[in-house]
């Protein structure tokens, strides 16, 4: 991932994350659940598909993504954060990479409708998401 991609992702995420807890967490998760029945069902099955439990998961998602974004300049730390996320999801039996890819793409779509978002910034998010998803896929392949 280039330095420019890192800057673009950090700048755009910062705009969204500033209001994540108060505004965007619930709005994004509502969009995500509406856009993907499979994701919605996975959360319902885990008991976190609505109400306070869903809000808590949305806040956790934001906090995890914040850690990923903050560590884009440190590949070792980023890898450890990604492995931690994967380990947690593995214990829950959630390893379907299509769901993770959809969630990250849906986040980019959400950002495109809520903050000023250029084509270059969108491309940077795609590059960063590809790195995250590749590492996740590699992790799940080694622990399957």
UniProtKB/Swiss-Prot annotation:
Heme b binds at residue 89. Residues 1-141 form the Globin domain. Gene3D superfamilies: Globins. Pfam families: Globin. Keywords: Heme, Iron, Metal-binding, Oxygen transport, Transport. It comes from the Eukaryota. The keyword Transmembrane does not apply. GO terms for molecular function: heme binding; metal ion binding; oxygen binding; oxygen carrier activity. Homodimer. Belongs to the globin family. This is Globin-1.
């Amino acid at each position: 991932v280039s330095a420019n991609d890192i800057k673009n992702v950090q700048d755009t995420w910062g705009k969204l994350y500033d209001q994540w807890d108060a505004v965007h967490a619930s709005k994004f998760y509502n969009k995500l659940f509406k856009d993907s029945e499979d994701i919605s069902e996975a959360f319902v099955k885990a008991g976190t598909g609505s109400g306070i439990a869903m809000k808590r998961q949305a806040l956790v998602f934001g906090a995890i993504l914040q850690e990923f974004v903050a560590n884009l300049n440190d590949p070792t730390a980023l890898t450890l954060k990604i492995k931690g996320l994967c380990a947690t999801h593995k214990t829950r039996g959630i390893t379907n990479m299509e769901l993770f890819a959809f969630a990250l793409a849906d986040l980019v779509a959400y950002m495109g409708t809520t903050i000023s978002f250029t084509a270059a910034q969108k491309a940077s998010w795609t590059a960063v998401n590809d790195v995250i998803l590749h590492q996740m896929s590699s992790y799940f392949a080694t622990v399957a």
